[in-house]
Amino acid sequence: RRTAIELGADNAPYVVGAADQGGYADVISPPSSRPLQNGDVLMLDTGCVWDGYFCDFDRNWAIGQADELACRAYDVLWRATQAGIDAARPGATCRDLYVAMSTVIAEIDDSGGEIGRLGHGLGMQLTEQPSHAIFDTTVLKENMVLTIEPSLSYGNGKMMVHEENIVVSEGQARLLTERAQPELPMI
């Protein structure tokens, strides 16, 4: 939070996260006195405000090392995020973004995912319409600000989520966040 404000954010109202061996079971977990351990996957989600506008993003890290399944889940999630970014063009629909991401997610998570969303609008509120969901046929327009936020389930009750912020533009969506590394970072 302090770093975000030092780098120019007016406010960083929250930092939430989760961590456990090989992955986490919930995106927003209550605080725990359990120390991080070798093999944990840590996710932090934060939002900042600048001049009244929100950003909303998260990142994942492995503590020490990651098991093969967590690395595979991260790879699928990174590629699903890229599919969402690539699909975000004027004239596409939120459903198109959802389908692009869920097609990649299905490589590891065959739960179907017909409930929920894989991103949302972003602006003067942290979460705005539209929703990247199977039911949302909102047509994307140039200069819309969106999150690309795929999530997936894997292993025995584990999940992983990733989030980037973009501006819809002709040709290619423009990232507002620094794109996460293509491989699960180890710290």
Q: Where does each model-flagged region fall?
A:
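Active-site neighborhoods and metal-handling regions in enzymes and metal-associated proteins
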Residues: R1-I187
